[in-house]
Amino acid sequence: FNVDLYMYAHQFDIRLFKKLTITALEGIFVNAPVELRYLNPFTIFHGMAPWREYPDEDDDSSYDRESHTGAYLGIKFQFTPVSNLKFYGLFAMTQFQTSYETSNYPDDTTPNAMGGQLGGRYILPVSKGRFTFALEGSYAQPYLYIKESPNWSLVRTYAENMGNKKYPFYEWIGSPFGPDTISGELNMGYEVPEKWALNFIYLFMARGEMSGTSVFDTMVGS
């Protein structure tokens, strides 16, 4: 556990025909002190290959070993075909092995790490209030957000002043459900703005063995 954890991110938005918005978001999570080079809004983080600049003292066997950094790429859209109706989606990725990498580095077992989210929301005004109907689904591959160490995996890290300090608390940066999860949520409700609201929410999740944060308990650097 240490405090030198910083998330740098920038995004580019395009709005088309007043109905469709497309967003490209890039981020880099760095286990190192603040560096001004990451604050340039026009920098392509992945093009800098910063993982090569933070050598892992415990393992220098591979030049391309990712160390002290965790990359994030997101593509989002929001589509409003008519008033009060919205559809949205997100594709997220923290690792992808190209065909060049798999063919030239056959011993590299780094898994792909991708996920997606898709949903819709409809608002029906009635009397002085409004009904809301929403449906959302998400999928995350087993190693989304997870890197070689919790110190540069995409998680927030907390520690207690009391109790057992050996195991810190982790909170995923991104989906609160974390990796290795399929989820679906149905939300229906009625509200009178600034007065009262009543909602029915049903959440279903199917979670695998990598979905919790206990995976970090056995990782180097935890």
What are these regions (language model features)?
Residues 1-162, 166, 179-182, 186, ...:
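Signature for the C-terminal beta-barrel architecture of outer-membrane proteins
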Residues 170-176:
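Radical SAM enzyme core and accessory elements
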Residues 184, 195-198:
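Secondary-structure boundary/capping micro-motif
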